[in-house]
């Protein structure tokens, strides 16, 4: 044996991947034996991203690859987030996790399913002007604030606003958060007492505003910088800045570079929004939609002010089970100081624009990037082909469902028949007397002569006429016949086997016969 050789015979040699290896995956290659790499995407955080599909080309998703040591990676955090939202039933507000794993204990990967539709960044490029209509902004506000509500309720925060992370599902016309790179655990008091692991994770990673861009950054980050911890109120303040920027074209501090100046302008901006608007003499039905949107923004700012005051009061209360403990029926429940329903309803009414509920579904409203197509022969053919394609997909899905249902019922039928056979055998075994079970040989073959003699005796017994009741003469004749049959049976059995002494009634040993035979012996002895 060579002494210079290092290692053990049972030791596994693992290849250590580098960032260059993860960044240079070739297209049309198979990853992990499941996913075909189609295209390289933009890097998100520390993860390298690729567009992939499965072998049957039915599932498409984004592959995230990241190198981490000692489970310190953002992918593990995102996998926990996706699993939690899926278990809670909120997958429609976020992307769905398809696959995840670890390669050689240092390369973390996950595949997130994508839905057909453009990103918000691409849709904003399609706007004809710098400003967005209040209907489109309200449409976006309903979906985004709903996603933020779910995030804060489940103990997560969004550390940045990036239009590339939000996508439109063209099938449901719903905006959802497609990328969870900037999502991290919350350091809120309600969530810190859940478990020690959650607490250590929240204190060991960065929880402040992620980017150095201060346009949408909350005031607490502008004031505290790196010691800032992103909270629920910070996310709502971020959405307030985003909505105002979309509808008014430019925020007052967008061109400013001084941190102190930006802080002053944001404080003044929030104070002006929280003030009461000037009274108008217009009738309520004649007020412009833009005015309604400004009122919704003011209500938004007022809700945040009230929520901050209530949170300062609740911070002084004890914590039990990971939630503040208010008085009343919700004493043990996790609560939020933000009135999400009131904020979302204001923007929802703007999208509906006073139309009846049965006139048009609010998600089918025309947005700024929607275009009307002329009814030409080419467009009609395109729509017909699309409808046929959708119909064929529905038929194939229904056929697969029926096929699975048929297989399921076949398995259930076989299982039921097996269980019935087991139960029937158990019933027969339970009802069979122990003496018969002991007397009946299992593997012993019967003599054909004995079977023939038994058949003759049985035939004679079946040929008897039915006797009358309470007739002693008939009973005596039957007993004599039984005795003769018994003698015949004993003689046939003695001839087939070794000679044995036939037990006699006077010997005292009981006969293995019926009661009628014993009575016949007693009559003959007399």
UniProtKB/Swiss-Prot annotation:
GO terms for biological process: positive regulation of piRNA transcription; signal transduction. Residues 489-498 have a biased composition (Low complexity). Residues 436-526 are annotated as: Disordered. GO terms for cellular component: autosome; cytoplasm; nucleus. The keyword Transcription applies. Expressed in male and female germ cells. Residues 458-467 have a biased composition (Basic residues). Disulfide bonds: none annotated. Residues 439-448, 468-487 have a biased composition (Basic and acidic residues). This is piRNA biogenesis factor prde-1. It comes from Caenorhabditis elegans. The lineage of its organism: Eukaryota, Metazoa, Ecdysozoa, Nematoda, Chromadorea.
